[in-house]
Swiss-Prot record:
Feature: compositional bias, Basic residues: 158-175, 445-462
Compositionally biased region (Pro residues): 285-295
Gene: Bnip5
Compositional bias of kind Polar residues: 48-73, 346-357
Domain of life: Eukaryota
UniProt entry tagged with the keyword Ubl conjugation: yes
Compositionally biased spans, kind Basic and acidic residues: 34-47, 104-113, 131-148, 390-401
Region described as Disordered: 1-116, 131-259, 273-401, 413-544
Keywords (A to Z) from UniProt: Isopeptide bond, Ubl conjugation
Sequence position, cross-link Glycyl lysine isopeptide (Lys-Gly) (interchain with G-Cter in SUMO2): K314
Alphabetical list of InterPro entries matching this protein: BNIP5
Pfam families associated with the record: CF222
Keyword Hydrolase appears in the UniProt entry: no
Species lineage: Eukaryota, Metazoa, Chordata, Craniata, Vertebrata
Protein name: Protein BNIP5
Origin species: Mus musculus
Length: 669
């Protein structure tokens, strides 16, 4: 552009003179300023006028001066009000955003206003910097000590800064993208207006670069990194920049403080959470090891208690069957291996305990011992105590009476067989005596020999029968009754008992089976009879034989009640004793009936003739004999003397002493 052009159209002369520039030099600087700011319109708010850089040196000081003046925004507002009052009304309109109109493109109206505003800005900056210097020093000292929370104490200033920032964002959204950074360019243009043309021409390219750096506006962080707080040269250029950056840095400072406070609060919250977690974490770790430790102890204690209960239950359960076995003699394992002198009276009749009550007693005793696994030992002793207390006597009495009853019946049967054998022997002797008469001494010796032979033959038969039962595998083959005793006495009647009489009869095997099995059951009286083979004497069908057997049993019971009071009383007291007769064959029953009938006849004859009764001495010897042998055979053996033609007492008077001496000499005891 030609330098002869007058740039000061519409502008007073004193203003151009106050700038100290010649009319030739001023248009050059303004021309450059216009060329830089041709595309960028000015900001409408009053803060944008304070953000312009007058020179490159002042652009370097922007961030440091802004940091100094950010602590005193109130003073800046006061200074701004003073400048507004000092300006004339025509010039003050340029600072207000509401009254500021759109920029004019004519050179005559724009250039004088820019020069005037630049000079006024310099004066105001100098005044403000002189006022704010002591306050900036105080604020630096407080920052060096770490007094950061000043912004937290001034919430009103924060609100203002947030409002200003939001207003700027609104203005920036309204403008195009190319028009966003107008502040630094206008500031550079105004700075060039204030600089002489000779200096401006030399520093033009450098200022353009600095203007581009400062063009970041309020959103760029470069102005904060460029300056340092050590540069505090108090020049008019630096004073002129004091009022510009505070409003740019004001919205940022509170933001940084807010961020710092937010970070501090977050750290505090995180620390509290960590402390709470550290307090809560050891509790679940410490508690679980404490809780499971008593659990195995409880389990081990329960196991020990259960084992103790089982052992304590096993001991009384094993002891109770032993007690019951000794009291009631249940099986062969509780019986003695070697019988005493009279196994018939002591151990052979144990099968009589197989009655209904005797069968119920061991069941009652065995149930609590088997099922008492979960009960307490004290509960198991109570039934045993009750059983062994008042109920033991009746059971023992019944068992003893049944044994006594069986023994008497067997003795009666043995006597009947002996009588038959004697009758046969006497008949044979009579025949021989008729042919060859022999002395009486020889006859007696022959009778004794026949008796001995019969006894030994019975021994052989009994041993053979026992072997047969063992070979057949009967349930009672292992018992002591089925085995022959090791030592036999002279009297097979007392030693081997009923075996002698039954072995001669065809039903000996069946009778031994029933004796070994413990007698006939209570509910099946006909079982042993059906399993037993019939003799040829019985003849017809089993039904007739059963009817005849029942009739004979009734007749036998009636005769027993008449002949022997003790046996009759026992049958009346225990009707189940009648089942014992089912074990005998019909032949043996007939023998018993015949023997009892003969005894009835003898008793009736003795009642008629008192002379035939034995003297008291004979009864004394009989009682003595019965006491020593534990056999009451007085009434059963009275028929013995009738066949010889004299009474039983007379027979005893002649042979009692001789027979007793023979028995004592030949018996094992």
């Amino acid at each position: 552009m030609p330098r002869s052009r007058n740039p000061s159209q519409g502008m007073p002369r004193d203003s151009s003179d106050s700038c100290g520039l010649s009319p030739v030099e001023t248009p050059k600087g303004k021309k450059r300023a216009r060329s830089l700011d041709r595309q960028v319109p000015r900001k409408k708010d009053p803060e944008s006028s304070n953000t312009r850089c007058p020179s490159s040196a002042t652009c370097r000081r922007t961030a440091s001066d802004g940091a100094r003046s950010s602590e005193s925004p109130s003073h800046f507002a006061e200074a701004q009000g003073a400048t507004a009052a000092a300006l004339p009304p025509g010039e003050g309109r340029g600072f207000l955003p509401s009254e500021q109109g759109p920029p004019e493109d004519t050179k005559k109206e724009r250039l004088p206003r820019e020069a005037q505003q630049s000079w006024l800005r310099l004066v105001l900056n100098i005044l403000l910097m002189r006022i704010e210097e002591p306050r900036e020093k105080a604020s630096r000292a407080s920052k060096g000590k770490g007094d950061l929370p000043e912004a937290a104490e001034e919430p009103a200033l924060r609100k203002k800064s947030h409002e200003k920032r939001t207003s700027r964002k609104k203005h920036s959204h309204r403008k195009p993208i190319a028009e966003e950074p107008p502040g630094p360019q206008t500031a550079e243009a105004q700075g060039r207006e204030d600089v002489p043309p000779s200096l401006a021409a030399s520093s033009a390219p450098h200022e353009i670069a600095l203007g581009l750096i400062c063009r970041g506006g309020p959103d760029s962080d470069l102005p904060q990194a460029l300056p340092t707080e050590g540069d505090h040269a108090e020049t008019p250029d630096s004073f002129g920049q004091a009022s510009g950056p505070p409003l740019e840095e004001d919205p940022r400072k509170p933001d940084q403080d807010d961020v710092i406070w937010q970070i501090v609060e977050l750290l505090k919250k995180a620390g509290d959470q960590l402390e709470e977690e550290q307090v809560q974490i050891p509790q679940p770790e410490a508690v679980p090891p404490r809780k499971p430790t008593p659990l195995p102890r409880k389990k081990s204690q329960e196991k020990k208690s259960s084992l103790k209960r089982v052992l304590s239950l096993k001991k009384p359960a094993s002891e109770e069957p032993k007690r019951v076995g000794t009291a009631t003699t249940l099986g062969p394992e509780t019986r003695p291996k070697r019988p005493s002198f009279l196994p018939l009276c002591v151990s052979s009749q144990r099968a009589s305990t197989s009655s209904s009550l005797d069968l119920e007693a061991p069941e009652f005793q065995e149930v609590p011992s088997v099922d008492g696994g979960g009960s307490h030992p004290s509960e198991l002793h109570t039934p045993a105590a009750i059983f062994q207390g008042p109920e033991e006597k009746p059971l023992l009495d019944r068992a003893s009476e049944s044994r006594e009853f069986r023994r008497k019946i067997l003795v009666l049967l043995q006597s009947a067989e002996d009588e038959r054998g004697e009758q046969e022997a006497q008949a044979q002797e009579a025949e021989k005596a008729g042919e060859n008469p022999t002395p009486a001494g020889k006859v007696k010796s022959q009778v004794k020999k026949s008796n001995l032979r019969r006894a030994f033959s019975l021994r052989k038969h009994s041993s053979k029968d026992s072997k047969k039962t063992e070979a057949s595998g009967t349930p009672g083959s292992g018992s002591l009754e089925a085995r022959p005793p090791k030592k036999h006495g002279f009297l097979p009647m007392c030693v081997s008992g009923h075996r002698a009489s039954i072995s001669s009869s065809p039903e000996s095997l069946e009778f031994q089976k029933t004796e070994a099995a413990g007698g006939a059951p209570a509910g099946s009286p006909g079982a042993p009879f059906q399993a037993r083979s019939h003799t040829p004497d019985e003849g017809p069908s089993p039904e007739r034989a059963w009817e005849s057997k029942e009739f004979m049993i009734q007749k036998l019971v009636a005769s027993l009640q008449e002949v022997d009071r003790d046996l009759g009383r026992q049958i009346r007291k225990y009707p189940s004793f009648k089942r014992f007769f089912n074990e005998f064959s019909d032949a043996s029953l007939r023998k018993l009936v015949a023997t009892l009938e003969r005894q009835k006849a003898s008793l009736s004859e003795e009642g008629r003739s008192l002379a035939n009764r034995p003297p008291p001495c004979a009864f004394g010897t009989l009682n003595k004999f019965a006491a020593t042998r534990s056999c009451t055979i007085c009434t059963l053996m009275q028929s013995r003397g009738e066949y010889k033609g004299h009474s039983y007492a007379h027979f005893l008077s002649r042979k009692a002493e001789q027979d007793i001496t023979n028995l004592d000499s030949q018996s094992p005891d």
